[in-house]
């Protein structure tokens, strides 16, 4: 799956013609403001806005340097990284989601493992990088905090003829472990499929200890081309033991030479068309006999296969395959399971976590299996404990959350209705509907409780993906619903309850039989052309924004006026131009003007400089793209659908976003806006380069006095960095900053200005 850029803290500087510039600042509720209480089945969720879990990988690392091993989760759906701090005692499972550490990690790619390669007790980071393996050293200290340093962009191995990268297809997860017990980390990966009817495991032996006496990752050789003397059959979910063909027929001997053709096969490994779609492998002594076994998952297979070592660690030969592992409840997902080891309950024993490794093709709700190790330090015994580990503390409605704020029961409190792609079913389809969280708090302190995961039984209708908007579509005074869908159609639900009564929504089929805008329609309602009739403005795939002109107030009827509202071409702004757009036209403050705000599933949020009544208006100004290249893992990685409403009666609208993983996040409006910002000359400070790596310059007017300068990150945390002023140029030395998005606040002659930059 392509890397999706993440949703981070939103800092929008919105410039509008005829207005002073507004600084709009939205923050997660976990920062500087008490968290919103979310209740499910009588239990308050610990991490409601963590964003959901779909196809995740799990690693153990002391994130906050308190001596306890925490959990790092990397989800391939949305390239989302999450950190969970271990706050449990001995024999206790208790983890706390903490967004402060998410953006301390580098860009991961498709897979991630954390192992201590240099023996300093700190887990280092190995991850996918262009079909190879990148390594980041954990250089965290009490003064630095959590910090990683790139050691090598692609780990190499040497032969007598070549030195090349160890190729790992992005869909695979290799095993990085001390295979032979010599004190450094080796690498096991599935090999090139062209040489056998299946795939052997190749062992890349780490010779750093042998050559230097110190553990490292400097010297790898290909030690065995058929480690374990077995292959995984390409034609089915089968492990073939004691395979007699090449290269296993060589007696599992050491091989450090490659022919040119074999070398080329290695280079092309990541793009092979004749190999299966992906494999995962985990090396561990699962039987307690001192020999390394291997647990294998495969794309297209629902179970994991434990191959047991009947020889020794140097000359491993697998002589038995267990297909129902673990025995207490065998790992079984629709496809492509992966497994990870770590001590979850603080008893000193490694536990087992299993999760699907492919997005959009497997379970997305009960999909994180935790097996606690009830054995001992020598002989592990994994017992099933939980099917929703960590996910049970989050809002998670399967996949593709599309939230809306609405007062469904007309009690004056704003509730949350969430449409979604839905829950994955065993036949490969999705059960799509509406999930309702009712506000049981007060007007100033919202508190939400799950009422149903299938509001009004709408999943039985068969609509694939609900993306709802609520408004009075027939001018009878009550609130109706129109929903978009994955097929690009729109569906009408009439509210027959009457004004001021709890909703009674009834599906009216074939209302919009000729209204199809493509795929993944996501509407909002607004009288855009100011003719007194509500229109629909809908995002869809490829970032298109459609204007559907309303024809009548008495009954919902719309005509597609343009599929490119304002000639906006968001595809040119994104790395992956197939994403979907979502639109909200709302006030951000009680006395505010209406704002045209839009986002996409990648997590970017934009605003137009103005609302135009002419849908064919061209050359509109799209202000302040929030570039989150660095913030792939910050916050909820949302933007799948957005909505805004003042849920705490403070005169400011809060922002809710859905995530591809079925989660949501709510952001409080921290703006003291509209805030007038004095502008210099042409309404901007001249600053450059942006993005930047080590130096950032800001030009100020000649002969002006610089009173103060502060640099903060998106959390509002001040960063002490050196700067100098020569003539009218401020020079900021930013090399010490971690990659990210920063704001510079400047005071010149008692006037306040701001600038922003992205540290690469």
Predicted segments, located by residue:
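Bacterial Sec-dependent N-terminal signal peptides
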Residues: 1-26, 675-677, 690, 741, ...
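Intrinsically disordered, low-complexity segments enriched in Ser/Pro/Gly/Ala and basic residues
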Residues: 12, 16, 142, 258, ...
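Low-complexity, intrinsically disordered short peptide segments enriched in small/polar/basic residues
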Residues: 1, 7, 394, 514, ...
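Beta-propeller-forming repeat regions
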Residues: 21-677
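Short amphipathic alpha-helical "recognition" segments used for binding
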Residues: 6-7, 442, 658, 760
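C-terminal outer-membrane/trafficking sorting elements
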Residues: 678-760
């Amino acid at each position: 799956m392509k890397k999706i850029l993440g949703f981070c803290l939103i800092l929008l500087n919105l410039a509008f013609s005829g207005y002073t510039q507004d600084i709009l600042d939205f923050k997660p509720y976990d920062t500087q403001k008490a968290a919103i209480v979310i209740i499910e089945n009588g239990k308050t969720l610990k991490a409601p806005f963590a964003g959901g879990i779909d196809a995740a990988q799990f690693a153990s690392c002391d994130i906050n340097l308190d001596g306890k091993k925490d959990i790092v989760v990397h989800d391939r759906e949305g390239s989302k990284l999450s950190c969970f701090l271990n706050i449990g005692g001995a024999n206790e499972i208790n983890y706390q989601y903490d967004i402060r550490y998410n953006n301390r990690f580098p860009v991961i790619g498709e897979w991630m493992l954390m192992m201590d390669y240099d023996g300093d007790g700190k887990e280092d980071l190995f991850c996918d990088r262009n079909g190879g393996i990148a390594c980041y050293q954990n250089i965290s200290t009490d003064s630095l905090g959590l910090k990683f340093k790139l050691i090598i962009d692609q780990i190499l191995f040497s032969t007598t003829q070549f030195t090349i990268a160890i190729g790992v297809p992005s869909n695979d997860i290799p095993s990085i472990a001390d295979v032979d017990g010599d004190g450094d980390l080796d690498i096991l990966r599935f090999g090139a499929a062209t040489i056998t009817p299946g795939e052997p495991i190749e062992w890349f032996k780490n010779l750093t200890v042998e050559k230097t006496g110190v553990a490292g990752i400097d010297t790898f050789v290909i030690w065995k081309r058929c480690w374990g003397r077995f292959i995984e059959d390409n034609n089915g979910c089968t492990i073939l033991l004691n395979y007699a063909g090449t290269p296993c027929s060589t007696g599992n001997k050491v091989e450090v030479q490659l022919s040119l053709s074999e070398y080329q096969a290695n280079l092309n490994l990541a793009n092979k068309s004749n190999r299966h779609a992906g494999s995962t492998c985990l090396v561990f002594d699962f039987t307690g006999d001192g020999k390394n076994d291997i647990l294998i998952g495969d794309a297209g297979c629902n179970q994991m296969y434990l191959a047991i070592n009947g020889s020794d660690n140097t000359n491993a030969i697998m002589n038995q395959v267990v297909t129902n592992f673990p025995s207490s409840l065998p790992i079984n997902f629709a496809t492509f399971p992966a497994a990870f080891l770590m001590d979850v309950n603080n008893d000193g024993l490694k536990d087992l976590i299993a999760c699907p490794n492919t997005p959009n093709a497997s379970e997305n709700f009960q999909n994180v299996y935790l097996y606690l190790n009830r054995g001992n330090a020598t002989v592990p015994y994994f017992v099933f404990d939980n099917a929703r580990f960590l996910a049970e503390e989050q809002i998670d409605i399967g996949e593709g959350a599309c939230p809306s704020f609405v007062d469904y029961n007309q009690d004056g409190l704003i509730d949350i209705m969430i449409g979604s792609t839905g829950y994955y079913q065993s036949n490969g389809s999705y059960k799509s509907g509406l999930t309702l969280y009712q506000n049981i708090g007060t007007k100033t302190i919202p508190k939400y409780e799950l009422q149903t995961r299938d509001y009004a039984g709408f999943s039985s209708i068969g609509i694939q993906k609900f993306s709802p908007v609520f408004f009075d579509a027939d001018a009878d005074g009550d609130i109706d619903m129109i929903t978009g869908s994955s097929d690009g159609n729109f569906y009408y639900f009439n509210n027959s309850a009457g004004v001021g009564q709890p909703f009674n929504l009834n599906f009216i089929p074939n209302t919009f039989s000729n209204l199809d805008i493509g795929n993944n329609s996501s509407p909002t309602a607004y009288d855009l052309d100011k003719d007194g009739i509500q229109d629909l403005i809908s995002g869809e795939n490829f970032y298109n924004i459609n204007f559907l002109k309303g024809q009548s107030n008495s009954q919902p009827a719309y005509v597609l006026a343009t599929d490119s509202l304002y000639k906006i071409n968001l595809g040119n702004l994104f790395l992956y131009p197939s994403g979907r757009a979502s639109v909200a036209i709302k006030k951000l403050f009680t006395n505010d003007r209406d704002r045209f705000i839009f986002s996409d599933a990648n997590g970017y949020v934009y605003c137009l400089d103005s609302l135009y009544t002419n849908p064919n208006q061209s050359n509109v100004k799209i202000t302040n793209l929030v570039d989150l290249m660095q913030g792939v893992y910050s916050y909820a990685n949302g933007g799948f659908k957005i909505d805004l409403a003042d849920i705490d009666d403070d005169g400011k609208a809060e922002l809710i976003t859905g995530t591809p993983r079925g989660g949501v996040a709510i952001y409080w409006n921290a703006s003291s806006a509209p805030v007038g910002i004095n502008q210099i000359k042409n309404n901007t400070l001249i600053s450059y380069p942006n993005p930047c790596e080590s130096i950032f310059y800001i030009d100020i007017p000649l002969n002006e006095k610089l009173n103060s300068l502060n640099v903060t990150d998106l959390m509002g945390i001040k960063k002490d960095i050196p700067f100098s002023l020569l003539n009218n140029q401020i020079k900021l030395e930013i090399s010490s900053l971690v990659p990210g998005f920063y704001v510079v606040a400047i005071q010149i002659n008692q006037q306040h200005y701001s600038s922003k930059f992205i540290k690469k």
